[in-house]
Regions:
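A boundary/linker detector
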Residues: 1-49, 86-90, 94-128
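Short N-terminal micro-motifs specific to bacterial/archaeal maturation
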Residues: 16, 28, 60-63, 78
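Histidine-centered nuclease catalytic patch
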Residues: 38-71, 80-92
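Internal catalytic or translocation cores that form aromatic/hydrophobic pockets or channels
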Residues: 74-76
Length: 128
């Protein structure tokens, strides 16, 4: 007995529940260090900000805010996701219960708090 093939229906993408990132937030983060990589963790760091990294991942409730974003190069972005424990210690990743606005992050050897205006406030902890 010959079977008739099932008709395939196209997959539909679920609509996003979160609003899209505004260009103002994107430009503020990407220009915060003059277009340079803020993490500078990998030995192959290109130094050029190519990716917008969410410190608190979107899958963990992270939003498109200036305090939650880092401008990083491709190599550093890969390193951050490949080594989450080290990244969390440096502040490049924030847990789902954490607050990126109050969690310090290592930028240029200093632990700083990211401000909504696109600046830094020293957290008082120098990192070697």
């Amino acid at each position: 007995m010959k079977r008739t093939p099932l008709r395939r229906t196209p997959m539909r993408k679920k609509p996003s529940r979160k609003p899209p990132m505004t260009s103002e937030v994107y430009e503020t983060v990407m220009g915060r260090r003059g277009g340079r990589c803020e993490a500078h963790v990998a030995t192959k760091c290109t130094g050029r900000a190519e990716h917008w990294h969410h410190r608190q991942l979107r899958s963990r409730g992270g939003e498109h805010t200036v305090e939650n974003g880092l401008a990083v190069c491709h190599a550093c972005h890969e390193h951050i996701h490949r080594f989450p424990l080290d990244s969390r210690e440096a502040g490049y990743m924030v847990s789902s219960w954490g607050d990126p606005a109050t969690q310090p992050v290592r930028i240029g050897g200093l632990m700083v708090i990211l401000t909504p205006e696109g600046g830094y406030i020293a957290a008082g902890k120098k990192v070697a």
